[in-house]
Amino acid sequence: MAPNLSKAKDDLIGDVVAVDGLIKPPRFTLKGKDLAVDGHPFLLDVPANIRLTPASTLVPNSDVPAAAAGSFLGFDAPAAKDRHVVPIGKLRDTRFMSIFRFKVWWTTHWVGTNGRDVENETQMMILDQSGTKSSPTGPRPYVLLLPIVEGPFRACLESGKAEDYVHMVLESGSSTVRGSVFRSAVYLHAGDDPFDLVKDAMRVVRAHLGTFRLMEEKTPPPIVDKFGWCTWDAFYLKVHPEGVWEGVRRLADGGCPPGLVLIDDGWQSICHDDDDLGSGAEGMNRTSAGEQMPCRLIKFQENYKFREYKGGMGGFVREMKAAFPTVEQVYVWHALCGYWGGLRPGAPGLPPAKVVAPRLSPGLQRTMEDLAVDKIVNNGVGLVDPRRARELYEGLHSHLQASGIDGVKVDVIHLLEMVCEEYGGRVELAKAYFAGLTESVRRHFNGNGVIASMEHCNDFMLLGTEAVALGRVGDDFWCTDPSGDPDGTFWLQGCHMVHCAYNSLWMGAFIHPDWDMFQSTHPCAAFHAASRAVSGGPVYVSDAVGCHDFDLLRRLALPDGTILRCERYALPTRDCLFADPLHDGKTMLKIWNVNKFSGVLGAFNCQGGGWSREARRNMCAAGFSVPVTARASPADVEWSHGGGGGDRFAVYFVEARKLQLLRRDESVELTLEPFTYELLVVAPVRAIVSPELGIGFAPIGLANMLNAGGAVQGFEAARKDGDVAAEVAVKGAGEMVAYSSARPRLCKVNGQDAEFKYEDGIVTVDVPWTGSSKKLSRVEYFY
């Protein structure tokens, strides 16, 4: 039963709160029948059973000052039930962006203006700020509506259809777990910066729930700085040691050795239910990709393909790391429940398991049809009792650690909500499994050696991220459309970009975003590579063995298996937040990020397909796949998050290889063909002053790299032997580009005079490879 808050707290609704020692009214109030923020109504005709509680009454301001900007929504129900669908008010003529589950496992972006536009299984909504100052308190701020968990219940939002009502959906997942009184199922937060809005809100929710840690409290695993290779598209389930070895060798021979090797599905010991456990037969060679969901795990040890290698999996990993020194990290795949179909009941050496029939909630029934879900529902899941979940992860991970494995990709995470009926509901089952996973990861994989996948739901974010610090933020990279649409080779790539960019706004508070692998020989490979380069996350490919575009890969990876990574994770620019970059025929997806001494903008034409509300699936929308024009400005970069900032910028177009000077409020026009891109390095111009002249200077970076600005690791101006000098520390090798308002008298690289070119304000000089990304080159410009 949900906790019944005291009458005293109910009496505080709409009362004053203390902020920095001052008594102020709460920002959210019930104004007559309307829910308002700073006096601006945004949800109309709120039902009488809705309860509003200032966040500061549940989360003291002294702990989290941001609580002063928030409130919790709850309700009283006439009867205790395991699932409630409750209207919270009408939303009309107010632009919103949202994140909703379009598949069981995955979420994406959705926009609208009315309650009827809200999608099923919405995990987050942001209402746009108003553009008028009709109120004494100024324009309406951005408002975040964040469904969370309360007791054993989990919340989401959906459309009420009639009269533009928005509904709060609260469900336990078990008919035995019921409640009728709720006070904190949805969190509301107000703010003037949409990016700070989300981060501040998550800090309040973190203090309120105490069930997760924010990404700002954690460190991502070292693979985020590695160039990686994943075996999935190369082998699918047929992965084997010799093939993995050959794949690494071919990349190394081409000058792009991986620092990460991810052995995906296909290494485990599994069988079908009709296989005789006593026969010793294994099922991996009797199934195929897309058909493995009915299979179940029969032992923690690797299957015969790896077991028969001299020394088993451990021997293979040791020899591979010794032969290829750049390979510092080896990860393997496994499902949250062990395998797609869980564990085989009665398998010796495994904790006891019971086959449970999954049940889809009404919300999940309205998601996109998924063959993987269908197969799991039809065959059930061999579920370990939650009280013994620790044994599952300890047995699996201890063996992997002993074999030299550095981390795991944990997939099929959002399965638990379908099998929770007999286990206290979705929240309690998730807590038990995530606690076991967290404990094991801390013991065996340095506390953060995990990639979370198929995890796009607030249950995981709010309950499973105590230790997990890296997770996929998009649906799988589909090289072709599994439904057979030949145009899917292209429009699905635009969908992938949009999934990742907008999901990061929400998920980035909990986990570092991972934009998934791609193939370097795909028709849209450069489109993908550009997004990965500035995503701020790991960069890894799933190329078939020996099938590589090395010219493209060398723009991503350094010769020692590392990458040039941005300082944070990429997010959509403000002017894209409430727009539709997939099927409005006019919006260009723009994302921003920062490097140490510059900002970066990525512009992508993703138009051409996406979610269809009518068909309940992603579909081609070829009519929108047209050239798109947009404007890009230094102001698109959120400089308060890093990169330097300033009033004058040297903007370098990585693909066009041109430079333009812009002030902060100036912009430049970009036109992109479908599924093409441009990357802009936005480098603040710094004045280098000498008695004789003033010089404007901005280090751009390595023009041969997609994240050119990521190469600049240090920058300072100094006087040397009477000369004015700009000194830049460079990571990587290639053509170093800088803006200079005057021609340098001399350039030096690592103390040696170097030839350089100067044309139209651009200085270029070649920088050699030092042998290690840890050893930076020193480039000096003398005036």
UniProtKB/Swiss-Prot annotation:
The keyword Glycosyltransferase applies. It catalyses: alpha-D-galactosyl-(1->3)-1D-myo-inositol + sucrose = raffinose + myo-inositol. Inhibited by Ag(2)+, Hg(2+), Zn(2+), p-chloromercuribenzoate (pCMB) and 1-deoxygalactonojirimycin. Optimum temperature is 45 degrees Celsius. The keyword DNA repair does not apply. Signal peptide: none annotated. Keywords: Carbohydrate metabolism, Glycosyltransferase, Transferase. It holds the Pfam family Raffinose_syn. Transmembrane segments: none annotated. Its EC number is 2.4.1.82. Optimum pH is 7.0. GO terms for molecular function: galactinol-sucrose galactosyltransferase activity. Transglycosidase operating by a ping-pong reaction mechanism. Involved in the synthesis of raffinose, a major soluble carbohydrate in seeds, roots and tubers. Specific for galactinol and p-nitrophenyl-alpha-D-galactoside as galactosyl donors. Able to utilize sucrose, lactose, 4-beta-galactobiose, N-acetyl-D-lactosamine, trehalose and lacto-N-biose as acceptors. May also act as a glycoside hydrolase. Belongs to the glycosyl hydrolases 36 family. This is Galactinol--sucrose galactosyltransferase.
